[in-house]
């Protein structure tokens, strides 16, 4: 028995030793696993940090490359301009020495020579100072910010600079045909032009090195108004006004004199084009009565080269307590929403009646959020969250907001059924309002900076948003969660959803690029930027994008003062990639908003220059300019349907002058004028 007991004890000891060894091995394995996991996580995080660093380095290199490219392009343009000036000066000197021996002109020049020395070579040197005047000061009237004075006062104050700057196109136009002729014909034409130059009697002709500021304007006859402006890319968009020096009745009457008011067919996509002269002169007093419509509160200037078949009229002016940052119509066009400081207003379009004023009293000063904040949504079935609303009579349903800080509503958007209104603000929140109860039913959180743009999907169950945090987010409104996040290199300023099924979303950003994604997969399908092969992209930040009504194109507006129409034929397989079809040049300051009419016949654009331009979509010609605000036109929107009757189209504008305005437009003699426009275009 003792041997059996001893064997049993020995077995137990061995089992205990095995158990202990197993426990030690398990503990060691767990320790190794934890250590390996830590090492693995550390290496992963380190590699992610390195990748992010590489990414940032690439972005910085790209930005540096763009800046260097812009600098080189500007330098090249400047050098080209200097070479052209030198060539013209040399040609003029050579021509002057030849023409100076002509017997018929010697007595005429000798009368003005006096103590001026060899004055017979002075007239050929006149173009050089005039061209330099255009480069030096001709840019100033358009680059400077608009002040609060009336446009007529600005024109009068800048008359001195414009008078000298207006002469450059004349010289260019006279000299360009000579470069295309054989030498003998050039000499004959030069002699003919020299004999046609009137000799001034108001002041003696100065030597080549003298001051010509006072003598040059007197040596150009009034009939030598420019008929076409051709300048290098660096100065093409800053051509000075010419209409200010012309008499009120000197509007062009024939097609030859009106060519510079129209865009040639082969230059529609070109970025650098001169601004049509009628857009440069904001003094409506100098415009013939048949080319303008003027009231105490606004005026309209028509393109002299096109029939005045469009009529624009102010319907309602809606006063606000602060800057109007955004305006948006409902899908049926019956209501208009406006966003300003802390409040969103909804108006009845037909009457201008205030239907609701929405504000969230719980909103406070925007606070920074953690980098890894979870994207969530808050819902509310009552008004206990501090939101307030007013009915059409202006009576508040709850206490007024006590917040002292500004909180501008940057974007508003109606749901397709018109029952809800989405608002985006500086506090990084998206609020969904029930317009019947005037309460917040959902709050979408996740953006880390100001929200600048919103757009509903046609189905109404999704919403896209763009923010300064460099992301575009798609929200599922059935669950209140973010279903897709798209990140780019710079802040997002504007977003839009394609019509129909909402298959694509477009976004504009501070990096001068328009991107188009597939809304289902998040794949980037088009990138429309200034680095394309043709160089037809935007040269500055893109502040507004909108799809055309047929969904086949995108319209964009930029701080480079241009509007562009991009076709999306590449998405349908017709072409390998999208391209710029038309560049609309006419604004004198930043383009802040763009919109299209229902049939895509017209494009509307609002600008910091306080104007709204109507563009013919296909030709790129500006049809008219509306000046109806005393500050920047921040937002433009066009209504669907005909809320003011079948004969009127309706659009609205929001401005920094604390006003939102509803306008109506109509066409007069549509069939007759459309035929005339077609003939002019052809």
UniProtKB/Swiss-Prot annotation:
Q: Where is this region: Disordered?
A: 97-257, 359-400
Q: Where is the composition biased (Low complexity)?
A: 114-123, 172-194, 221-255
Keyword presence, Secreted? no
Which keywords has UniProt assigned to this entry? Repeat, Repressor, Transcription, Transcription regulation, WD repeat
Comp. bias regions, Polar residues: 145-160, 374-400
The record's WD repeats, renumbered to this chain, cover: 319-359, 404-443, 446-485, 487-527, 537-576, 586-625, 628-673
The task this protein performs is described as: Represses transcription by RNA polymerase II.
What name does the UniProt record give this protein?
A: General transcriptional corepressor TUP1
Instruction: Tell me the gene name.
Output: TUP1
């Amino acid at each position: 028995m003792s041997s059996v007991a001893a064997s049993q004890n020995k077995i137990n000891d061995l089992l205990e030793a095995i158990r202990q060894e197993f426990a030690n091995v398990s503990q060691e394995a767990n320790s190794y696993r934890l250590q390996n996991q830590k090492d693995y996580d550390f290496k992963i995080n380190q590699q992610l940090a390195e990748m992010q660093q590489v990414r940032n380095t690439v972005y910085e290199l790209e930005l540096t490359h763009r800046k260097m490219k812009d600098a080189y392009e500007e330098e090249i343009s400047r050098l080209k301009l200097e070479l052209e000036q030198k060539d013209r000066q040399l040609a003029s000197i050579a021509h002057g020495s030849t023409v100076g021996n002509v017997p018929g002109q010697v007595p005429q020049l000798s009368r003005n020579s006096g103590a001026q020395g060899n004055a017979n070579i002075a007239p050929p040197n006149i173009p050089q100072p005039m061209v330099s005047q255009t480069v030096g000061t001709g840019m100033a009237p358009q680059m400077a910010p608009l002040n609060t004075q009336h446009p007529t006062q600005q024109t009068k104050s800048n008359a001195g600079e414009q008078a000298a700057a207006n002469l450059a196109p004349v010289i260019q136009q006279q000299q360009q045909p000579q470069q295309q002729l054989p030498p003998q014909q050039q000499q004959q034409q030069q002699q003919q032009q020299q004999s046609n130059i009137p000799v001034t009697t108001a002041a003696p002709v100065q030597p080549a090195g003298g001051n010509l500021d006072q003598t040059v304007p007197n040596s150009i006859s009034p009939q030598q108004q420019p008929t076409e402006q051709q300048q290098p890319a660096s100065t093409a968009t800053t051509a000075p006004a010419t209409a200010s020096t012309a008499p009120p009745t000197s509007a062009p009457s024939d097609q030859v004199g009106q060519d510079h008011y129209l865009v040639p067919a082969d230059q529609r996509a070109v970025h650098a084009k001169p601004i049509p002269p009628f857009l440069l002169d904001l003094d409506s007093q100098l415009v013939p009565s048949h080319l303008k419509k003027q009231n105490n509160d606004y005026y309209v200037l028509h393109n002299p080269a096109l029939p005045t078949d469009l009529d624009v009229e102010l319907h309602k002016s809606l006063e606000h307590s602060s800057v109007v940052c955004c305006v948006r119509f409902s899908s049926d066009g019956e209501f208009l929403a406006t966003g300003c400081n802390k409040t969103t207003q909804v108006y009845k379009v037909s009457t201008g009646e205030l239907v609701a004023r929405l504000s969230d009293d719980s909103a406070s000063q925007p606070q920074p959020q953690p980098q890894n904040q979870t994207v969530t949504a808050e819902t509310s079935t009552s008004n206990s969250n501090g939101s307030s609303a007013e009915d059409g009579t202006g009576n508040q349903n709850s206490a007024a907001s006590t917040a002292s800080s500004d909180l501008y509503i940057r974007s508003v958007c109606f749901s397709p059924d018109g029952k809800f209104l989405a608002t985006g603000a500086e506090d990084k929140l998206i609020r969904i309002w029930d317009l019947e109860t005037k309460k917040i039913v959902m709050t979408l959180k996740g953006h880390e900076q100001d929200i600048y743009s919103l757009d509903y999907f046609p189905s109404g169950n999704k919403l896209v948003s763009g923010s300064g945090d460099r992301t575009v987010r798609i929200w599922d409104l059935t669950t209140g969660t973010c279903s897709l996040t798209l990140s780019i290199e710079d802040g997002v300023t504007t977003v839009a959803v394609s019509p129909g099924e909402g298959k694509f979303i477009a976004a504009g950003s501070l990096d001068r690029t328009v991107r188009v994604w597939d809304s289902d997969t998040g794949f980037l399908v088009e990138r429309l930027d200034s680095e394309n092969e043709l160089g037809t992209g935007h040269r500055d930040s893109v502040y507004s994008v909108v799809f055309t009504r047929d969904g086949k194109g995108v319209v964009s507006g930029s701080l480079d003062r241009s509007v562009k129409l991009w076709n999306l034929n590449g998405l349908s397989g017709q072409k390998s990639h999208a391209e710029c079809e038309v560049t609309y040049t006419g604004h004198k300051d930043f383009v802040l908003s763009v919109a299209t009419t229902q049939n895509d016949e017209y494009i509307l654009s609002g600008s910091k220059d306080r104007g709204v331009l109507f563009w013919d979509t296909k030709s790129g010609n500006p049809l008219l300019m509306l000046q109806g605000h005393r500050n920047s036109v921040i937002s433009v929107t066009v209504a669907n349907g005909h809320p003011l009757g079948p004969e009127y189209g309706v659009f609205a504008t929001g401005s920094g002058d604390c006003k939102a305005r509803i306008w109506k437009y109509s066409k007069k003699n549509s069939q007759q004028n459309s035929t005339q426009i077609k003939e002019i275009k052809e």
